[in-house]
């Protein structure tokens, strides 16, 4: 599916210079609750206006298409210190290449075997931590009750903070797999108490199992309405 999608897109769009497969399909356990996303990144000569696209294949499988500009890969030094793009380019599966792009960028990224060494690893972790702290500071002095916008920022802050710990032992964790994989990552760095801390920051101490079960039907209804609206 990834190859077919890539062939179709590059045939109709000469701006695409490369494409690669990344994400959970490259992991040992790509499925989550019987569902999976196929994550494809297209690299363009110039960044298009629409940088993200989701395509439903079946109720359980979707294409998650990201678009990046070639200029984002110019500096190997910056790429090694990027907590997201660095890992994304470190070991993906190349699907297409119009120009000589992929091998050069990947070789520069891997040069000297420095990528996974403590100095660069800590640099990436600190970037995530700084980003999370910055978002937290932005919402910590609200002069009005928190609404959906502030809750979204809070969740993003927590997302970056959790990944600041996760990236000590591997690549950052995507949103949909965050709680599923964080326990093993915290254990890998001997910080198992952070798992309970993360759940606590999500409000787990304020709800019980029965209450959550009561929300499921409302979630299903809202999801159905959102899906119908998007179609």
What are these regions (language model features)?
Residues 1-17, 22-91:
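Metal-dependent nucleotidyltransferase catalytic core
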Residues 70-141, 145:
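Internal, well-ordered alpha/beta segment that forms a basic, Gly-enriched binding/recognition surface
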Residues 1-3, 100-109, 198, 202, ...:
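Generic hydrophobic, helix-prone segments enriched in Leu/Val/Ile
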Residues 13, 29-31, 40-46, 54, ...:
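Aromatic-residue detector
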Residues 1, 83-103, 107-110, 114, ...:
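Solvent-exposed, charged interface segments at domain starts and junctions
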Residues 120-231:
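Conserved nucleotidyltransferase catalytic core and NTase-mimicking acidic/glycine-rich helix/loop elements
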Residues 63-70, 113-116, 195-197:
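Short secondary-structure transition/capping segments
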């Amino acid at each position: 599916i990834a190859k077919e999608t890539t062939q179709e897109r590059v045939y109709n769009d000469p701006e695409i210079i490369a494409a690669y497969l990344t994400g959970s399909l490259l992991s040992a356990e790509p499925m989550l609750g019987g569902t999976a996303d196929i994550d494809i990144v297209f690299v363009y000569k110039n960044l298009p206006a629409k940088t993200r696209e989701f395509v439903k294949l079946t109720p359980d499988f979707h294409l998650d298409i990201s678009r990046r500009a070639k200029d984002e890969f110019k500096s190997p030094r910056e790429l090694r210190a990027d907590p997201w793009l660095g890992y994304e380019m470190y070991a993906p599966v190349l699907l297409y290449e119009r120009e000589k792009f992929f091998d050069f960028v990947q070789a520069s990224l891997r040069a000297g075997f420095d990528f996974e060494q403590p100095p660069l690893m800590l640099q990436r972790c600190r970037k995530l931590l700084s980003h999370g702290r910055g978002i937290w500071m932005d919402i910590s002095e609200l002069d009005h009750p928190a609404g959906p916008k502030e809750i979204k920022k809070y969740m993003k802050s927590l997302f970056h903070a959790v990944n600041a710990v996760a990236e000590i032992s591997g690549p950052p964790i995507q949103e949909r797999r965050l709680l599923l994989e964080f326990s093993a990552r915290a254990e890998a760095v001997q910080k198992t108490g952070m798992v309970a801390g993360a759940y606590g920051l999500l409000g787990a101490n304020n709800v019980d199992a029965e209450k959550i079960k009561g929300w499921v039907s409302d979630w299903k209804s809202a999801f159905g309405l959102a899906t119908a609206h998007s179609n």
